């Protein structure tokens, strides 16, 4: 028996591997990937507004529109809607105007959006009814939920058809004070009546909660259906009417975001029951949607599984793209039904190095879905040597690259007394000089052009990315005069001497307070736990501030804690990025619009920047179609923020994805968030490749055998010596 156990141990030793998945998982029709941060905080389509969350939200929820996965420039396509529509315009008397009517004549823009008939919600207990038509699980008493932590632990699951009223209800949810609603400030400026609706719902919510404990986890269901919203009406079951205040061309793009995806009232009623919050049952973990996938496994900070939605509508892979797509094999699946895979499995791997190694071994089909820098990172590795390049080519790693509309920047909290706006004209002048000095000192060209090339890009000169209408980034002679200058026809970063002068104007000569002599210490609120590779980037940033004599203190937290900090306005200097929601300058300029303040209005202006003239121009920009007037307004807004320097601008990142050779149809595209539905996996190729790349490791067996032989020889010699000694003693 001991011999059998030993043989088994040796066999296991030879066959062991570091696959994070069960044996045989590679043979399944499943897409495997990693996530490096904590689990997503918000999967509720009303609340979700981060790139890691979008990996799941856009596959589970379906807004009216989406983006063609292959065409560039980006092209809108219908998703939950039957078609992409143009608005019509009304004057103050409700009379219809021509499409080219002047903006000052337009009182309303009306979108009549046909909803696809036959759309069904994913299976969920919220829809289950008994024989009398009564909801089975809408009247749970305390304790009845038990230890159930997933909707799929309920006996009865059901569905129903999606109707226009579900889209109306979703828009109303942006007024619910119990939900995180980051775009409510934007929507309330445009959707007719939404601003008043916010006040109404807040008042009714307060009434409902009167007398209840403030920290009550399971608040009663706030039924938004009882209060009408003028700007969102269901004309019939399959026609949604949205009314906007005046012309707002960018609304078509908002219709392609999760914020306009339908939500069933039954889900809110279901989750607003005793015990749900304690058991982590909510739309933020178990959203109800109409998309190709549904969340079927959620293990906090460890593993998420999306499975094929059995109720998903008929959908097919596109048959056209842009030049080069056919040659790259991206049209080979023309007309085939999607999604291709049955499951999408994401596992938590904390650091980039192990993610990269798992990808190289074939265990991950792609590193991370939401990160557009993995292709850049691996391309740097590939080009490091001929040997590595040959290795990459032999394994067939796909690294498609592009320059996309996304950015990374260092921001200053406008509410902070040192780096923010300042309370007096004199303080405002000093703080602005400090921000400008820092903006000059941080050499983005060095950091993310030469050192951290795996995350690299081009230094930014303002908030408007190249590739959208009106952008001047990268054009000859175009630069930020605060941070750069023209030398012999070449744009160069201003010398540190210019930054030193600004430090003196700010009252910090040599990095010390001119009045007290104390060193200037600033806090850098970092949104991730610092790993060794992230430490290198942070150390580089510390050196940039040290050029000015400024001490930079790193205050690192995980992403969820960072979000809490910025909501309270407790941050000072921070690192942030933005992947465009839609291909328009407004989607970047709104990050600096005052009413979108993150800490004051829970918007996406994380710097809490406020400038009345910038805000006035932003409001004007919103009603302008692409043309000379819009370009002029954009230029003026660019000039304002360059002078104010609420951001240190950072860089425009390169976009590059990474796929195994057996993953088909992958293409970079920052606004295409529903990529998983289009990806096809050749499981047979994956199975063969993983077996070939990760064969049994025999050297431990050899070492074991050599060690065993040495022990045997040593034991034999000792035994022989003892026998000889015994024989010698006996002869005496």
Model-derived regions: residue spans:
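A structural "hinge/loop" feature
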Residues: 37-57, 68-69, 77, 125-128, ...
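N-terminal export signals
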Residues: 1-18
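Residue-level recognition of beta-strand termini and adjacent short loop/turns
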Residues: 105-107, 236, 300
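A C-terminal, polar beta->alpha supersecondary segment
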Residues: 264-268, 272-274, 657-694
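Extracytoplasmic/lumenal ectodomains and periplasmic regions of secretory and membrane proteins
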Residues: 635, 640-663, 667-668
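Aromatic-residue-lined binding/catalytic grooves and analogous aromatic/hydrophobic interfacial grooves
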Residues: 236-239, 249, 261
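Extracytoplasmic/periplasmic ligand-capture domains
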Residues: 15-24, 69-70, 113-180, 205-233, ...
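N-terminal lobe/hinge region of extracytoplasmic solute-binding protein
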Residues: 34-103, 288
């Amino acid at each position: 028996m001991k011999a059998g156990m030993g043989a088994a141990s040796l066999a296991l030793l030879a066959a062991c591997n570091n696959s994070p998945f069960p044996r045989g998982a590679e043979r399944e029709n499943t897409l495997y990937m990693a996530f490096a941060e904590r689990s997503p905080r918000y999967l509720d389509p009303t609340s979700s507004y981060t790139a890691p969350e979008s990996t799941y939200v856009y596959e589970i929820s379906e807004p009216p529109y989406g983006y063609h996965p292959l065409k560039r420039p980006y092209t809108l396509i219908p998703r939950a809607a039957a078609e992409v529509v143009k608005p019509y315009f009304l004057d103050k008397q409700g009379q219809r105007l021509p499409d080219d009517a002047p903006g000052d004549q337009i009182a309303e823009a009306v979108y009549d959006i046909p909803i696809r008939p036959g759309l069904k919600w994913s299976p969920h207990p919220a829809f289950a009814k008994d024989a009398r038509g009564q909801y089975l699980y809408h009247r749970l008493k305390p304790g009845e939920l038990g230890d159930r932590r997933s909707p799929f632990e309920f006996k009865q699951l059901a569905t129903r058809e999606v109707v226009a009223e579900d889209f109306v209800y979703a828009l109303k949810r942006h007024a619910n004070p119990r939900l995180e609603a980051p775009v409510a400030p934007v929507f309330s400026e445009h959707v007719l009546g939404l601003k008043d609706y916010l006040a109404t719902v807040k008042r009714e919510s307060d009434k409902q909660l009167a007398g209840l404990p403030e920290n009550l986890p399971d608040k009663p269901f706030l039924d938004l259906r009882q209060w009408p919203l003028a700007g969102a009406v269901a004309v019939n079951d399959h026609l949604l009417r949205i009314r906007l205040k005046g012309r707002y061309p960018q609304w078509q793009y908002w219709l392609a975001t999760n914020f306009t995806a339908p939500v069933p009232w039954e889900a809110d009623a279901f989750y607003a029951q005793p015990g749900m919050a304690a058991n982590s049952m909510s739309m933020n973990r178990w959203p109800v949607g109409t998309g190709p996938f549904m969340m079927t496994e959620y293990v906090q900070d460890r593993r998420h599984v999306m499975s094929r939605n059995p109720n998903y509508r008929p959908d097919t892979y596109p048959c056209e793209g842009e030049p080069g797509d056919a040659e790259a094999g991206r049209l080979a699946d023309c007309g085939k039904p999607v999604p291709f895979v049955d499951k999408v499995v994401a596992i938590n791997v904390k650091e980039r190095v192990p993610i990269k190694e798992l990808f190289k071994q074939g265990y991950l089909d792609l590193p991370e879905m939401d990160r557009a820098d993995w292709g850049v990172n691996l391309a740097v590795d590939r080009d490091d040597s001929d040997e590595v390049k040959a290795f990459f080519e032999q394994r067939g790693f796909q690294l498609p690259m592009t320059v996309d509309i996304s950015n990374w920047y260092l921001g200053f909290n406008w509410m902070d007394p040192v780096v923010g706006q300042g309370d007096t004209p004199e303080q405002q002048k000093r703080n602005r000089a400090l921000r400008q000095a820092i903006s000059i000192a941080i050499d983005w060209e060095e950091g993310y052009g030469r050192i951290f090339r795996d995350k690299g890009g081009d230094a930014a000169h303002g908030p408007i990315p190249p590739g959208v209408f009106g952008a001047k980034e990268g054009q000859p002679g175009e630069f930020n005069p605060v941070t750069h200058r023209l030398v012999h026809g070449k744009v160069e970063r201003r010398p540190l001497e210019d930054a030193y002068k600004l430090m003196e104007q700010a009252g910090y000569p040599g990095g010390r307070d001119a009045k007290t002599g104390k060193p200037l210490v600033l806090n850098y609120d970092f949104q991730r736990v610092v790993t060794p590779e992230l430490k290198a980037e942070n150390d580089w940033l510390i050196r940039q501030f040290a050029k000015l004599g400024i001490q930079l203190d790193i205050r690192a937290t995980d992403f969820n804690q960072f979000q809490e900090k910025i909501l309270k306005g407790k941050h000072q200097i921070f690192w942030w990025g933005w992947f465009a929601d839609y291909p328009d300058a407004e989607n970047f300029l709104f990050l600096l619009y005052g009413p979108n303040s993150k800490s004051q209005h829970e918007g996406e202006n994380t710097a809490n920047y406020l400038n009345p003239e910038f805000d006035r121009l932003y409001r004007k920009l919103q009603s302008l179609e692409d043309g000379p007037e819009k370009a002029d307004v954009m230029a003026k807004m660019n000039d304002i923020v360059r002078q104010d320097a609420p951001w240190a601008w950072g860089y425009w990142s390169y976009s590059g994805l990474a796929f195994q050779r057996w993953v088909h149809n992958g293409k970079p595209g920052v606004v295409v968030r529903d990529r998983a539905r289009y990806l096809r996996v050749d499981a047979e190729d994956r199975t063969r490749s993983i077996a070939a790349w990760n064969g049994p490791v025999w050297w431990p067996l050899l070492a074991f055998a050599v060690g065993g032989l040495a022990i045997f020889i040593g034991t034999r010699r000792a035994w022989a010596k003892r026998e000889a000694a015994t024989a010698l003693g006996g002869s005496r």
